[in-house]
Design a protein with these regions (language model features):
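Acidic, divalent-metal-binding catalytic cores of TOPRIM
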Residues: 1-227
Length: 227
């Protein structure tokens, strides 16, 4: 029984919050994904953290997002790879918050139309992929690959990182980890382990990643500190 209700006080019921994420493949990997995002949210000082729903493929993630949106009893966001660099007209710029629905609406393989009632901020990108986020934090890479990382093989961790293609990122990672004990980057084995160590302040330098953290409610003092 709610004591506040007995005293005549208004009862505030907080909506459930869901983040539908592209990724995962099996129960163990799904658990790693949820843990990595929860750690990222904690480090970013996000108080009201959404529950992470691991949706595997991007099409399933979009469908899950639409279904939760239709139910109307929760706050929901969709986080997917942009897969490709975002066109200039849809990019984040001064005076323009970016147009993610235009990107997936015209992208071959998606052709997603913005669902009724969905806002621009409910669609978030790992631009162009999760590997962008991983490469942004050299220290996180070192914690997983331990030694032998060739940082000079990796692209600059600044804003231009979000303009690199998936092929560029994969090639750079392959070259950078060649002399580590793992010898190669394996998305299933490594990606969420690295993400668990990624610093929100490093992500804050990337416009689309910063947009995501801001929408999730990141604390400014946690993400804007120099590193």
């Amino acid at each position: 029984m709610d004591i506040g209700a007995l005293r005549g006080k208004p009862v505030v019921t907080r909506k459930k919050q869901w983040l539908c994420v592209e990724g995962g493949a099996h129960p163990d990997l799904d658990a790693e994904c949820r843990k990595a995002f929860m750690l990222l949210f904690q480090k970013a000082g996000i108080a009201n953290r959404p529950k992470v729903r691991v949706c595997h493929g991007r099409s399933k993630a979009f469908k899950t997002f639409c279904n939760l949106l239709d139910e109307g009893d929760c706050d929901v966001w969709l986080l997917v790879d942009s897969e490709e660099p975002i066109a200039a007209g849809h990019q984040i710029a001064v005076g323009h918050e970016g147009d993610p629905w235009a990107h997936v609406g015209t992208r071959e393989g998606d052709r997603w139309q913005r669902p009724s009632g969905a806002t621009h901020k409910q669609l978030q990108f790992m631009t162009v992929s999760m590997e962008t986020w991983l490469i942004s934090d050299r220290d996180a890479l070192k914690k997983v690959f331990t030694k032998g990382l060739q940082e000079d093989k990796l692209p600059s961790p600044g804003p231009s990182l979000e303009t690199r293609t998936k092929q560029d990122l994969q090639k750079a990672l392959a070259a950078a980890v060649r002399d580590t004990p793992a010898e190669r980057y394996d998305k299933g084995a490594h990606s969420f382990k690295i993400l668990a160590h990624v610093s929100p302040a490093k992500l804050w330098r990337l416009p689309w990643a910063a947009r995501f953290l801001a929408e999730m409610g990141a604390a400014p003092d946690r993400v804007s500190r120099p590193e």
